[in-house]
A protein has these predicted regions:
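A cross-family signal for key residues in well-ordered alpha-helices
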Residues: 20, 146, 163
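Short, hydrophobic beta-strand segments that form beta-sheet elements in well-ordered domains
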Residues: 94, 160-163
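Substrate-recognition "cap/lid" segment bordering the active-site pocket of phosphatases
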Residues: 105-159
Length: 168
């Protein structure tokens, strides 16, 4: 019986890639989108590509990031799926190579139990172009899943994972 369901966020629960949406709002879409596609296909190192993509956001107003994070489009059926899993007492978690600025509002809307992601560094309401957090490497999700399984005392057959990219 499934007791834990872990979802990726970008292009899985959310319809699109947060970094691409932020880049478009900051007129840096062209610079970021190709890197995102290549990283998700496993052609680029996830950590290096994340750093490079975030560097293009340097100078972006942080309050704009937060507003965009509030309005990210969720996939059709996301609410119903999470509601169903919650009704079965399945612990629902988001593992995102994206950002808390995007997943945190969605977690509240969807009633997700827990989320792990990265943070966009900022000072004086301006992005620094740097990123940090628990999901910065290609193996971060696997390591966090193992920790979570141990913490919840679960076996592999009690866990379901849903994702779309090379780091999922």
């Amino acid at each position: 019986m499934i007791k834990l369901c872990v979802f990726d966020f970008d292009s899985t629960l959310m319809d699109g890639e947060t970094i691409d949406i932020l880049a478009k709002a900051y007129d840096k879409e062209k610079e970021v989108v190709d890197i995102t596609h290549r990283a998700m296909a496993g052609e680029l190192d996830f950590f290096e590509s994340l750093q490079e993509r975030v560097s293009f956001l340097k100078g972006m107003p942080y309050d704009l990031v937060l507003k965009i994070g509030q309005d990210l489009p969720l996939m059709n059926g996301a609410y119903e799926l999470i509601e169903f899993l919650n009704s079965k007492n399945i612990f629902v978690v988001i593992f995102s190579g994206g950002f808390h600025e995007g997943i945190d509002p969605a977690m509240k809307k969807l009633k997700v139990n827990l989320g792990f992601a990265n943070y966009l560094h900022h000072k004086n309401n301006t992005l620094s172009g740097l990123v940090g957090g628990e999901m910065m490497f290609s193996n971060s999700k696997g390591l966090m899943l193992q920790r979570l399984k141990n913490f919840l005392n679960l076996q592999t057959h009690e866990v379901m994972c849903v994702g779309d990219g090379a780091n999922d």
